[in-house]
Amino acid sequence: MFYPDPFDVIIIGGGHAGTEAAMAAARMGQQTLLLTHNIDTLGQMSCNPAIGGIGKGHLVKEVDALGGLMAKAIDQAGIQFRILNASKGPAVRATRAQADRVLYRQAVRTALENQPNLMIFQQAVEDLIVENDRVVGAVTQMGLKFRAKAVVLTVGTFLDGKIHIGLDNYSGGRAGDPPSIPLSRRLRELPLRVGRLKTGTPPRIDARTIDFSVLAQQHGDNPMPVFSFMGNASQHPQQVPCYITHTNEKTHDVIRSNLDRSPMYAGVIEGVGPRYCPSIEDKVMRFADRNQHQIFLEPEGLTSNEIYPNGISTSLPFDVQMQIVRSMQGMENAKIVRPGYAIEYDFFDPRDLKPTLESKFIQGLFFAGQINGTTGYEEAAAQGLLAGLNAARLSADKEGWAPARSQAYLGVLVDDLCTLGTKEPYRMFTSRAEYRLMLREDNADLRLTEIGRELGLVDDERWARFNEKLENIERERQRLKSTWVTPSAEAAAEVNAHLTAPLSREASGEDLLRRPEMTYEKLTTLTPFAPALTDEQAAEQVEIQVKYEGYIARQQDEIEKQLRNENTLLPATLDYRQVSGLSNEVIAKLNDHKPASIGQASRISGVTPAAISILLVWLKKQGMLRRSA
C-alpha cells in the first residue's frame, strides 16, 4: 500500500549524514520523511566516541555555519574539549571533543523530534521506486510505499554489510544491527558503479578492570573550547580525562604470530581499508621499525564503564584481542565487553554524482556519507547537509548549490569525490585544501552563513547573532585603525613595555597588532587601545584578520599562479623518491601513474595541493620547469 501523504524529500538512514540531510530539508520548508530501521539509534556513534580533529573540525564548523546539527549536539554531549595544533597558525588549528555517546544520541534525537516539517518512521527500506530514470519513492520491509520528489541515501555501512572477527564472518550493518541486503541488490540493478570498502573498530574495555594509576592522564583545555558559533561552554556536561598507554614488543609479537588468523591477511576481506585509520595489525606490519604505538583510552560516557582504546582497531580473533589488550601497561587484567571487528560494505563510485550529490543517471536520487566512499562522522554530516539541501531545492524546482574549493572544506570534499573518486575510505585533512589559510575553523560562519541564509538553512536567531558579530568586527577594526600612539606620547612608555623594539614612529592599533609579540588581549589592556570587545568570537576574528592580512593576499596570488602551472610538464623518467618533502602515499601514486603534467598529477586521488607546490619548487630548483604550448 501507499502511505496516504506524499513527501517532498525522503531520507533513508538515520546516522550522521541522514540526520543532517533530514534537518536541512525540513529547515528549508520541505515536507521531509526520515526512514530508519531503528529510531533508538538515530545519531549513533558507531565507532569512536569523538567529534572533530584536523580537517574534520573544520567540516563541523561549516555544517554549523549552515545551520546544521552536529556542533550543537557535541556542545551538549562533549566530555573533553581540546584545540589541536593550538601552537600553530589558525589555518590548521582544529577543535576536537570526546563525546558521551548517550548524551550525543539524545541531543540529535531531541533536535529531530522537534524539527517542523520532519516526520520520522521506523522501517527498513528494501526498494526504491524508479520510473523513467527518476526516483519517485521508497518501499519498506513491510511493503509500505512512500512517494517523494527526491530521495537521499545515507545508509552507512549497511549495504550488504559483512562483519569479520578472525576467520569467522556474518552479515550485519554494524554490531547489533542487521544489514541491508535487499536494498543493496536493488541498487546494483541501477546503472551505478559499485565497489567494496572496509572499516574496523577496536574492542571495548571495562574501565573497572584497568589500572589507571600507572597511566598518564590527558585533560581537556581550560578555558573549554566550543564547537557551535551559537554555543557556549556552560552547555558542556562534566569534563573527564583520557588516559594514554602504548603497545610494546610483546603486543607486536602476538600480532605477528597470529596474522594467518587475520581476515585481511588471509584474503577473506576484499574491501579496501582506511589508510589513515589502519588496524593495529596493519600498523605493526607497515611500521615494522616502531617498537610501540600510542593508544588513547577514551571514556564512552559519564554513566558508562566502557572504554574505547583508540589505536587498536582490529579484526583478529577474540582470543588474540584478549592477548593484545592484556599485553599493554595498565591493562594486564582488562576485560573486553565488546569485541573489535572489521566490516566490509558496498559503496558507489562518487564520480557518478553531480557536485550537488545527485546521481547523474537517476534523477532525484542523492547519495551522502560512507556510501560515497568516505570515512568519518564529520565527512558524512557535511555530505548529508549538502545532499539534503539540494534534495529540498530539487523538490521545489530550484537549481542545486555546491560550494567551490575556495569557499569551504565541504567544497574540497565534494570536488575530490566527484572529480577524482576514491579507491579507499576518504577522510578530510587540511592538506587537501589549496586555500587553507582562508578556510579556517574560526571564519566558517563568515564564509557560509550568508549563503545559508539565502538557501533557507539559517534561522532568524543565528542570522541576528551573525550580523551582530560582523558589526563588532568592522567597528573594532575601524577603532584600531583610527587610534594612534606616537613615540613622544605619554602612553608610549606603557606600549613600549610590551614591544621587543620601542616605537620609532607613529603607530595605529592595527600596526601594533601586526607585530608578532603583540596579541589583541594584550593590546586592549593598554590605555590608548582599551577596552577589549566582549564578543570573544569577534575579538579572535579581528586579531586573525589583522595579523594574516598580508599572507591571505599573498595566497590569493599563489592560487592564480597555480592555475598557470596546469600545463607544467613532468619528466616521464622522474623517480619521485628524489623529491624531498613528498609523503610516501604521494610518491607511490606518482610513480605508479607517471603523470605527464602538473595538471594530471593534481587530479590523482591522494596527491594534495601541498604536494603539487613541493613538486613545482623542486622542478624550479632543478631547472626543469617546462610548460607545454
From Swiss-Prot:
GO terms for molecular function: flavin adenine dinucleotide binding; protein homodimerization activity. It is found in: Cytoplasm. Keywords: Cytoplasm, FAD, Flavoprotein, NAD, tRNA processing. Its main location: cytoplasm. GO terms for cellular component: cytosol; cytosolic tRNA wobble base thiouridylase complex. Pfam families: GIDA, GIDA_C_1st, SAM_GIDA_C. Disulfide bonds: none annotated. The keyword Transport does not apply. The keyword tRNA processing applies. It comes from the Bacteria. Its cofactor is FAD. NAD(+) binds at residues 273-287. NAD-binding protein involved in the addition of a carboxymethylaminomethyl (cmnm) group at the wobble position (U34) of certain tRNAs, forming tRNA-cmnm(5)s(2)U34. Homodimer. Heterotetramer of two MnmE and two MnmG subunits. This is tRNA uridine 5-carboxymethylaminomethyl modification enzyme MnmG.
